[in-house]
């Protein structure tokens, strides 16, 4: 039997799936994203984890047809990432580095782009050749498939909607260094930042004040319960 691994590298966690060659998910795992030292340990930790899975399940390495890595940033056709602000990466050929570390075949792409391909193959976009994908997490990503082909753009950033400026008067910089990016308001981390700003400047009672470590899920949960401040935050996104 042949196998493949799919890896979604997020700014908070890394999701790893073991798949059959026809795209059926057999098992999945999640590990924290180690962003210390500008993310230099991320690829090693992924490779070590996958190799432990291969060993524990008695899978022959020759039966692994490859590993697909989704990266939250622009990726060129050779697997080179010039910058990935949510991981701390700069000027790294992820494809070459991961192959050296893991000794496994690997393909690398922008996370939203490969997610769009996955939906076209096995998900909500099955049967369609034109698919638009928006990913929300630590950051915001966009993937576009037209006529069955990923729209990458000249620098691999064709779907990077998260760093599209939407507010001219934002004083706080985005991770990318610009101001007023979409990601600052609608990502999981962005909505928490906006919530903290609102709670500092708003004296209305809110259940959001009860959380020691507020996250996006808390905000949406409290909004469904009728919290006025939480609802305003959700509406503003």
Residue ranges and their predicted role:
Residues 2-8, 64-68, 131-135, 173-175:
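Short glycine-aspartate micro-motif
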